[in-house]
Regions:
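Active-site neighborhood of divalent metal-dependent phosphoester bond hydrolases
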Residues: 1-81
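Acidic, His/Gly-rich catalytic cores of divalent-metal-dependent hydrolytic chemistry
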Residues: 44-190
Length: 190
């Protein structure tokens, strides 16, 4: 927030989607995850709810009320700041949930507590599109090609800690139709 171009960066950031869907490649890009109870249409709609507040004069109130671990279970009956916080937590903080989809926002490691599962393994998950997500660098050593489950790629490879910055090429390329993972060394301030 003390950067000379902080206002410009914040203005740009508030204009970005919480969920990006590419129809051509049937692929979704999110920061952390998608609530298992949401299908693609619901997820896009819920992302737009938060985006519209971020791009409005209600942004200050949202930022004051955004942080918190509750509610931890999605319900269409949620309203106001609680609803927006729950949506935001799914898109930006989620790693683990229980079998019913209740968030566990305290666990951050690569091994789930006994009563939790990674969000992308939830048995009732409703999205079949390719999903790319970050936010979970501790998965870096568990899956060599970053595909944690068929069609789901964890792209956080620890760049913020001086490790690697990764991306997945989705389009057809000179090597054929196979997806290509690219990874470059990250930069850390000394």
């Amino acid at each position: 927030l003390s950067a000379p171009d902080a206002k410009e960066l914040i203005d740009w950031l508030t204009q970005q989607p919480l969920m990006y869907y590419d129809k051509r490649y049937h692929s979704i890009l999110v920061h952390a995850g998608i609530a298992p109870a949401w299908d693609r249409v619901m997820a896009l709609s819920h992302a737009k709810e938060v985006e519209s507040v971020l791009q409005s004069d209600k942004i200050a109130g949202f930022l004051e009320n955004m942080y918190g671990d509750e509610p931890s279970m999605w319900s269409e009956d949620l309203e106001g700041w609680e609803r927006l916080r729950c949506i935001t937590n799914h898109f930006t903080r989620m790693r683990y949930c229980d079998h019913d989809g209740k968030l566990n926002l305290t666990e951050k490691g690569s091994h789930a507590p006994e009563d939790c599962i990674p969000w992308y393994t939830a048995p009732h998950r409703k999205i079949d599109d390719l999903i790319l997500f970050g936010h979970w660098a501790s998965l870096v050593n568990q899956h060599e090609n970053r595909e944690v489950k068929p069609g789901i790629f964890a792209l956080d490879t620890g760049c913020v800690w001086g490790k690697r910055l990764s991306a997945l090429r989705l389009d057809e390329n000179k090597f054929g139709n196979d997806r290509q993972l690219f990874s470059v060394k990250g930069y850390t301030k000394k």
